[in-house]
Amino acid sequence: MKNLRKCLEKINHLTLTILLTLTIFVNIPGISWATNLGIENNHLAPCPTSNNCVVSQNADAKHTIEPIKYHGEREQAKETLLKVLTVVPRTEVIEQTDNYIHALSKSRIFKFIDDVEFYLPEDESVIHIRSASRVGESDLGVNRRRMEQIRLALQDLDI
């Protein structure tokens, strides 16, 4: 009987530990699902009201950023952009189509995830850009700086 009681206590303790671990894991701030991504009606999604997003299409003053201009072929600009993204720290391309790239960028310490998007319309020689944090209200300018660094890298490569 004592052995059965000890066994049940261990099972209850293990179950509680698993439930607490899952609860904490699900509620970690850096882990959340992305929403409002991709291209709709030839536009990237607008930014939320929080101060942790920039976008080059249809943005208000605090969220606006210039698109990246290029000369030459769209496919070459896209390939160069993909090469640049391979050297952006903690950034991984997770989706790409003929005219769209979606990458994830993680913060160094807390591993917060930012969604980084690029749209290359067929009728313009620009790359529209969007970078948004998944959580929080402010990113202290990280998304804007990241996109400006990507812009500078592409300019250095003379796209």
Give the predicted meaning of each segment.
Residues 27-159:
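Ser/Thr-rich, low-complexity intrinsically disordered terminal regions
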Residues 9-10, 24, 33:
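Intrinsic disorder/low-complexity signature
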Residues 3-18:
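Bacterial N-terminal signal peptides that target proteins for export
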Residues 15-27:
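Bacterial N-terminal signal peptides
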